[in-house]
Amino acid sequence: MTRVPTISKDSGFVDAAPAAGQKNREYPGIPTTCDGSEAVVHVEVNVTQASGAYPITSSTNMGGGYNAAVSNGYRNLWGEPLVFVEPESEHSAATFCEGFAAAGGRVTNFTSGQGLVLMKEVLYTIAGKRLPVVMNIGARALTSHSLNVHAGHDDVMSVADVGWGKIGRAHV
Protein backbone atom coordinates (compact mmCIF):
# COMPACT_ATOMS: atom_id res chain seq x y z
CA MET A 1 0.00 0.00 0.00
CA THR A 2 1.42 3.35 -1.03
CA ARG A 3 0.88 6.29 1.22
CA VAL A 4 -0.05 9.76 0.03
CA PRO A 5 2.17 12.37 1.65
CA THR A 6 0.53 14.92 3.89
CA ILE A 7 1.94 18.30 3.09
CA SER A 8 1.17 21.41 5.07
CA LYS A 9 2.56 24.90 5.26
CA ASP A 10 4.33 23.80 8.44
CA SER A 11 5.81 20.63 6.95
CA GLY A 12 9.30 22.08 6.73
CA PHE A 13 9.71 21.44 3.01
CA VAL A 14 11.70 24.64 2.60
CA ASP A 15 15.02 24.56 4.42
CA ALA A 16 15.23 27.19 7.11
CA ALA A 17 18.24 28.44 9.03
CA PRO A 18 19.45 25.91 11.60
CA ALA A 19 18.12 26.26 15.13
CA ALA A 20 20.42 27.36 17.94
CA GLY A 21 22.99 24.67 18.66
CA GLN A 22 22.51 22.91 15.31
CA LYS A 23 25.12 22.98 12.58
CA ASN A 24 24.52 23.23 8.87
CA ARG A 25 24.24 19.88 7.16
CA GLU A 26 26.87 19.04 4.56
CA TYR A 27 24.09 18.26 2.08
CA PRO A 28 21.13 20.63 2.42
CA GLY A 29 17.69 19.15 2.19
CA ILE A 30 15.35 17.04 4.22
CA PRO A 31 16.74 13.78 5.57
CA THR A 32 13.94 11.34 4.82
CA THR A 33 12.94 8.26 2.93
CA CYS A 34 10.28 8.38 0.25
CA ASP A 35 9.22 6.77 -2.98
CA GLY A 36 9.45 8.39 -6.40
CA SER A 37 5.91 9.78 -6.26
CA GLU A 38 6.60 11.58 -2.99
CA ALA A 39 9.85 13.00 -4.36
CA VAL A 40 8.00 14.35 -7.40
CA VAL A 41 5.31 15.94 -5.21
CA HIS A 42 7.98 17.53 -3.00
CA VAL A 43 9.54 19.26 -6.01
CA GLU A 44 6.33 20.19 -7.81
CA VAL A 45 4.57 21.83 -4.85
CA ASN A 46 7.59 24.07 -4.41
CA VAL A 47 8.21 25.16 -8.02
CA THR A 48 4.80 25.24 -9.71
CA GLN A 49 1.65 27.28 -9.31
CA ALA A 50 -0.88 24.68 -10.43
CA SER A 51 -1.57 21.14 -11.52
CA GLY A 52 -4.28 19.75 -13.73
CA ALA A 53 -4.46 16.00 -13.33
CA TYR A 54 -6.91 13.13 -13.55
CA PRO A 55 -6.16 10.17 -11.25
CA ILE A 56 -4.88 7.09 -13.04
CA THR A 57 -2.74 4.27 -11.68
CA SER A 58 0.35 4.62 -11.29
CA SER A 59 0.37 8.38 -10.98
CA THR A 60 -2.56 8.70 -8.56
CA ASN A 61 -0.30 9.28 -5.55
CA MET A 62 1.40 12.22 -7.22
CA GLY A 63 -1.89 13.99 -7.93
CA GLY A 64 -3.15 13.07 -4.46
CA GLY A 65 -0.07 14.53 -2.83
CA TYR A 66 -0.38 17.76 -4.78
CA ASN A 67 -4.07 17.96 -3.91
CA ALA A 68 -3.21 17.41 -0.23
CA ALA A 69 -0.80 20.34 -0.38
CA VAL A 70 -3.51 22.56 -1.88
CA SER A 71 -6.03 21.43 0.76
CA ASN A 72 -3.58 22.22 3.55
CA GLY A 73 -2.87 25.73 2.27
CA TYR A 74 0.72 25.03 1.23
CA ARG A 75 2.45 27.80 -0.72
CA ASN A 76 5.30 27.38 -3.20
CA LEU A 77 8.79 28.86 -2.83
CA TRP A 78 7.54 32.26 -4.03
CA GLY A 79 4.74 32.31 -1.47
CA GLU A 80 2.03 31.75 -4.07
CA PRO A 81 -0.99 29.57 -3.26
CA LEU A 82 -1.30 26.35 -5.26
CA VAL A 83 -4.19 25.39 -7.54
CA PHE A 84 -5.27 21.81 -8.26
CA VAL A 85 -7.87 21.01 -10.92
CA GLU A 86 -9.22 17.49 -11.43
CA PRO A 87 -11.33 17.60 -14.62
CA GLU A 88 -13.39 14.79 -16.17
CA SER A 89 -10.57 13.22 -18.21
CA GLU A 90 -6.86 13.25 -18.92
CA HIS A 91 -7.52 15.12 -22.18
CA SER A 92 -9.14 17.95 -20.22
CA ALA A 93 -6.32 17.89 -17.66
CA ALA A 94 -3.79 18.47 -20.44
CA THR A 95 -5.99 21.23 -21.87
CA PHE A 96 -6.09 22.94 -18.46
CA CYS A 97 -2.28 22.78 -18.32
CA GLU A 98 -2.07 24.25 -21.82
CA GLY A 99 -4.29 27.18 -20.87
CA PHE A 100 -2.56 27.81 -17.55
CA ALA A 101 0.87 27.84 -19.22
CA ALA A 102 -0.39 30.06 -22.05
CA ALA A 103 -1.52 32.55 -19.40
CA GLY A 104 2.04 32.60 -18.01
CA GLY A 105 1.75 30.12 -15.14
CA ARG A 106 4.05 27.31 -14.03
CA VAL A 107 2.00 24.12 -14.31
CA THR A 108 2.44 20.37 -14.04
CA ASN A 109 0.47 17.22 -14.82
CA PHE A 110 0.60 13.69 -13.40
CA THR A 111 -0.45 10.82 -15.66
CA SER A 112 0.37 7.39 -17.05
CA GLY A 113 -0.85 4.57 -19.28
CA GLN A 114 -4.00 5.09 -21.30
CA GLY A 115 -4.38 8.55 -19.79
CA LEU A 116 -1.20 9.70 -21.50
CA VAL A 117 -2.38 8.24 -24.80
CA LEU A 118 -5.76 9.98 -24.42
CA MET A 119 -4.12 13.40 -24.08
CA LYS A 120 -1.81 12.93 -27.09
CA GLU A 121 -3.79 15.38 -29.24
CA VAL A 122 -3.21 18.17 -26.72
CA LEU A 123 0.47 17.31 -26.29
CA TYR A 124 1.08 18.29 -29.92
CA THR A 125 -0.46 21.73 -29.39
CA ILE A 126 1.47 22.30 -26.16
CA ALA A 127 4.73 21.45 -27.94
CA GLY A 128 3.80 23.52 -30.99
CA LYS A 129 3.19 26.57 -28.82
CA ARG A 130 6.41 25.86 -26.87
CA LEU A 131 4.60 26.10 -23.56
CA PRO A 132 6.48 25.27 -20.34
CA VAL A 133 4.43 22.33 -19.06
CA VAL A 134 5.98 19.50 -17.01
CA MET A 135 4.45 16.02 -17.33
CA ASN A 136 5.26 13.58 -14.54
CA ILE A 137 4.61 10.12 -15.95
CA GLY A 138 4.42 6.95 -13.88
CA ALA A 139 5.44 4.87 -16.91
CA ARG A 140 3.38 1.76 -17.44
CA ALA A 141 2.74 -0.94 -20.00
CA LEU A 142 -0.10 -0.76 -22.51
CA THR A 143 -1.91 -3.83 -23.80
CA SER A 144 -4.71 -4.24 -26.31
CA HIS A 145 -6.50 -7.16 -24.68
CA SER A 146 -6.83 -5.90 -21.10
CA LEU A 147 -5.75 -3.18 -18.73
CA ASN A 148 -2.22 -3.46 -17.47
CA VAL A 149 -0.96 -1.63 -14.39
CA HIS A 150 2.55 -3.05 -14.51
CA ALA A 151 5.67 -1.03 -15.23
CA GLY A 152 6.74 -0.48 -18.80
CA HIS A 153 7.50 2.30 -21.23
CA ASP A 154 4.78 1.61 -23.77
CA ASP A 155 2.85 4.74 -22.79
CA VAL A 156 5.90 7.01 -22.99
CA MET A 157 6.95 5.57 -26.33
CA SER A 158 3.42 6.00 -27.72
CA VAL A 159 3.83 9.78 -27.39
CA ALA A 160 7.50 9.94 -28.36
CA ASP A 161 6.65 11.83 -31.56
CA VAL A 162 4.79 14.78 -30.02
CA GLY A 163 7.81 17.08 -29.76
CA TRP A 164 8.51 17.04 -26.03
CA GLY A 165 11.89 16.69 -24.37
CA LYS A 166 12.05 13.65 -22.12
CA ILE A 167 14.06 12.92 -19.01
CA GLY A 168 13.78 9.50 -17.41
CA ARG A 169 14.90 8.23 -14.03
CA ALA A 170 14.82 4.70 -12.69
CA HIS A 171 15.81 5.50 -9.09
CA VAL A 172 15.38 8.49 -6.81
Region locations from a protein language model:
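Acidic/polar active-site rim loop that often engages polyanionic ligands
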Residues: 160-168
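Conserved small/polar residues in nucleotide/adenosyl-binding loops
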Residues: 170-172
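Thiamine diphosphate
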Residues: 1-159
